[in-house]
C-alpha cells in the first residue's frame, strides 16, 4: 500500500488547533485518583502487595481488576477495594515454562477474560473468577515469510497486545521483533481467532479470510494497544514506532489508526496528529502511545513518555484534554537520574535501591511510564478508569464521571 495520503486529508482527524475553543483541558490539578491497586502498596517486587512492571489492566463489571504482572510472571485478580483475590502463574496453567510473560488482557461480552502469554506463544481464556478455561493459538517458531502459510495457521510466536469483541472474536498482535524486522524496519504479525461451537463446546478458529484482507501490518510498524468502538465496527491500534515513510511522517509522530473490524482494512482515519500537504507535521504524543480504550464517545490513550492519559472525541477526533504529569523520580533503563544520591532508573528500581512509589505522589497524578488502560461502566452504574502506573508499581483508579464532566 502506498502511504501517500492522496486526497484523504478531509477524512483525517486533525487534533491540533489554534482555536481557543479547541484548546485541550489539562485535568491534572482538577481530578485526582480515588485509589490505587494494590491498596496496601509496597512498590516493586513479588509480594502479595507488590507488582513488578505491570503491563495491562482490565476492569471487570463487578468492580474487580485483572492485572498482568510481567516481571513476576503472574496474573493478578484484585477486589474492588484493591485486595488480592487470586494469582495465576505457569504452575496453575500446568505449563513447564515459568516465564509465561503475561502482557495484554481483555474481556468479551460474556465476561470471559483473555490474557496473551508472550513467553509461551498462547492466549489463555479464563472465567470471570480467573478460573482457567482453555488456550487459544499454539506456540511456534517460524520466519516472517512462513508466518501466514497454511500449515502455520493460528500459531503464535510472542503475542502481546490483545482485544476481544463482544461476540468473543479475538484479535492479537504477535510482537516478535527480530522475526518480522526487515532492513531495520519493524513490523509484527497479526492474528484473528473467531469464536465457534463444536460438540457444545466453545472453540476458537483461525480467521484466514481476515489475514488475507487486513491492512494493519501494512499501515502500522509497532503496536500493542488496541480497542474496539462501542458499535463493534471499528478496530483502533496505537502506533508506537512509526517510520518516516508512513504518511510522510518526517518527525515520526505517534498516532492511533482506525480499521474495519470485519476486514481489517484501513479506514483513512488517524488520531493524535495534524496534516499539511498530505504529510503528518505535528502530533499530540511525546514519544510513545501505549494502551488505548474507548468509552462511549471518547477515546483514551496513554502517552507513556509524557506521563499522562490523553482524551479524544471519538467522532470528531478533537484532542479534548489530558490528565497526568511525568513523575520526577523516574527515568528509563537507558538513562540516569540521580536525585539526593539515588539513581531512579529502572535497573535500580528492580534491584530495590530506588523506591519511586514512595516519592511520586499518586494523588497528584505523577506517573512513571504509564502503560495499559481500561474504562467501564460497572454493574452498579458507576464509571471507572484504571491506568497502569508501571514503574511506580501500581494501578491508578479514577471516577470517570469526574473526568468526563469537563468535556460533556
Which functions belong to the PLM regions below?
Residues 22-50, 354-359:
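A short helix->beta-strand "capping" segment at the edge of beta-propeller domains
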Residues 24-40, 85-91, 132-147, 200-215, ...:
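Beta-propeller fold detector
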Residues 44-60, 93-108, 141-165, 215-230, ...:
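Beta-rich, blade/repeat-based domains predominating
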Residues 62-63, 110-111, 167-168, 231-233, ...:
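Short coil/turn segments that connect the beta-strands within blades of beta-propeller domains
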Residues 67-71, 115-119, 155, 172-176, ...:
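Conserved beta-strand positions in repeat-built beta-propeller and related beta-rich domains
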Residues 74-76, 121-124, 179, 186-192, ...:
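A short loop-to-beta-strand structural motif that recurs across blades of beta-propeller domains
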Residues 79-83, 127-131, 194-198, 260-264, ...:
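Short loop/turn segments that connect beta-strands within beta-propeller blades
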Residues 367-408:
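Blade-level signature of beta-propeller repeat domains, shared across WD40, Kelch, NHL, RCC1
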Amino acid at each position: 500500500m502506498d502511504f501517500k495520503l492522496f486526497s484523504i486529508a478531509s477524512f483525517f482527524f486533525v487534533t491540533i488547533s489554534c482555536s481557543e475553543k479547541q484548546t485541550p483541558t489539562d485535568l491534572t490539578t482538577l481530578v485526582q485518583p480515588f485509589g490505587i491497586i494494590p491498596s496496601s502498596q509496597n512498590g516493586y517486587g513479588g509480594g502479595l502487595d507488590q507488582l513488578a512492571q505491570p503491563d495491562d489492566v482490565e476492569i471487570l463489571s463487578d468492580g474487580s481488576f485483572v492485572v498482568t504482572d510481567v516481571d513476576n510472571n503472574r496474573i493478578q485478580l484484585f477486589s474492588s477495594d484493591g485486595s488480592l483475590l487470586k494469582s495465576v502463574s505457569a504452575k496453575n496453567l500446568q505449563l513447564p515454562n515459568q516465564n509465561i510473560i503475561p502482557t495484554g488482557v481483555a474481556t468479551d461480552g460474556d465476561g470471559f477474560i483473555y490474557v496473551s502469554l508472550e513467553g509461551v506463544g498462547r492466549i489463555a481464556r479464563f472465567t470471570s473468577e480467573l478460573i482457567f478455561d482453555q488456550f487459544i493459538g499454539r506456540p511456534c517458531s517460524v520466519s516472517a515469510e512462513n508466518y501466514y502459510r497454511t500449515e502455520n495457521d493460528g500459531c503464535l510466536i510472542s503475542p502481546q497486545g490483545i482485544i476481544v469483541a463482544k461476540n468473543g472474536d479475538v484479535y492479537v498482535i504477535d510482537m516478535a521483533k527480530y522475526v518480522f524486522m526487515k532492513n531495520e524496519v519493524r513490523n509484527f504479525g497479526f492474528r484473528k481467532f473467531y469464536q465457534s461451537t463444536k460438540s457444545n463446546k466453545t472453540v476458537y478458529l483461525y480467521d484466514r479470510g481476515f489475514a488475507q484482507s487486513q491492512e494493519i501490518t501494512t499501515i502500522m510498524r509497532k503496536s500493542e494497544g488496541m480497542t474496539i468502538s462501542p458499535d463493534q465496527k471499528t478496530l483502533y491500534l496505537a502506533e508506537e514506532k512509526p517510520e518516516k515513510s508512513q504518511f510522510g511522517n518526517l518527525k515520526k509522530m505517534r498516532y492511533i489508526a482506525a480499521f474495519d473490524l470485519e476486514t481489517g482494512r484501513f479506514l483513512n482515519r488517524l488520531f493524535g496528529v495534524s496534516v499539511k500537504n498530505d504529510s503528518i507535521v505535528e502530533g499530540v504524543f511525546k514519544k510513545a502511545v501505549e494502551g488505548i480504550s474507548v468509552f462511549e464517545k471518547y477515546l483514551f490513550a496513554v502517552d507513556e513518555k509524557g506521563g499522562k492519559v490523553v482524551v479524544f472525541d471519538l467522532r470528531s477526533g478533537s484532542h479534548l484534554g489530558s490528565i497526568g504529569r511525568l513523575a520526577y523520580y523516574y527515568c528509563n533503563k537507558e538513562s540516569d537520574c540521580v536525585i539526593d544520591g539515588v539513581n531512579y532508573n529502572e535497573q535500580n528500581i528492580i534491584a530495590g535501591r530506588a523506591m519511586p512509589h514512595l516519592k511520586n505522589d499518586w494523588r497528584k497524578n505523577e506517573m512513571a511510564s504509564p502503560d495499559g488502560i481500561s474504562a467501564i461502566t460497572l454493574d452498579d452504574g458507576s464509571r471507572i478508569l484504571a491506568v497502569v502506573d508501571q514503574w511506580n508499581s501500581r494501578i491508578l483508579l479514577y471516577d470517570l464521571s469526574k473526568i468526563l464532566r469537563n468535556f460533556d
